[in-house]
A protein has these predicted regions:
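Alpha-helical segments in soluble extracytoplasmic regions
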Residues: 42-78
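Short, charged, low-complexity loops and linkers
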Residues: 9-18, 79-90
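Short, charged/polar, low-complexity loop and linker segments
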Residues: 74-87, 108-117
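Leu/Val/Ala/Ile-rich N-terminal alpha-helices, chiefly Sec-type signal peptides and the beginnings
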Residues: 1-49
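Residue-level recognition of alpha-helical structural elements
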Residues: 19, 23, 45, 49, ...
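Preference for long, well-ordered alpha-helical segments
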Residues: 101, 105-164
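Charged, amphipathic alpha-helical oligomerization/scaffolding segments
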Residues: 22-36, 55, 59-62, 94-104, ...
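Short, flexible helical or helix-coil boundary motifs
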Residues: 14, 60-64, 147
């Protein structure tokens, strides 16, 4: 499944989450997707972005691993369905938005948590989502100089004035 479509599924699932375990599960799913997208970009992207892409993959792994992994549910791990990144800049912008939404949802869960362990679990998940989002933003910041290569174009973009 294409990355933007998977991200959309994740955003809808997060919006429909009714309680803390559902939100934590969606945070975990988002981090697993960040890991998968970072890995794919590291393998297939331009060499100059591979270090940043690996950092995204590692940040996603930290946020989707550990002893506090929620039960994934009947749908399984969505990131395992990733078959292509598609339009890389759009996929990264959407992933960044998803990770931002996850952070906001986790803040709400943490503020309502009465159990200290659950509170700190939320705080760790917030930090992980923020770190992954920072990595996405860094890749996006550097991506425009590689945009033509990422879309398979080797000349001026259609409609640009530099072709004259």
């Amino acid at each position: 499944m294409e990355a933007v479509r998977l991200i959309g599924v994740g955003r809808r699932a997060l919006a429909q989450s009714q309680d803390a375990p559902d939100i934590m599960r969606e945070a975990w799913q988002a981090q697993a997707l960040a890991q998968a997208m970072g890995s794919r970009l590291a393998m297939l992207g331009p060499p100059e972005l591979r270090g940043d892409a690996l950092s995204l993959s590692e940040a996603g792994a930290r946020g989707s691993g550990g002893s506090a992994v929620p039960v994934v549910g009947a749908g399984g791990i969505r990131a395992a369905q990733l078959t292509e990144l598609g339009e890389v800049d759009r996929a990264l912008r959407e992933l960044g938005a998803l990770l931002g939404d996850v952070g906001i949802a986790l803040v709400a869960v943490a503020s309502e948590s009465f159990e200290e362990g659950a509170y700190w679990q939320c705080m760790e998940a917030i930090d992980a989502a923020d770190e992954s989002r920072d990595r996405v933003l860094e890749i996006l910041r550097r991506l425009p100089e590689h945009d033509d290569r990422m879309h398979g174009r080797h000349g001026p973009a259609p409609g640009s004035d530099s072709a004259a």
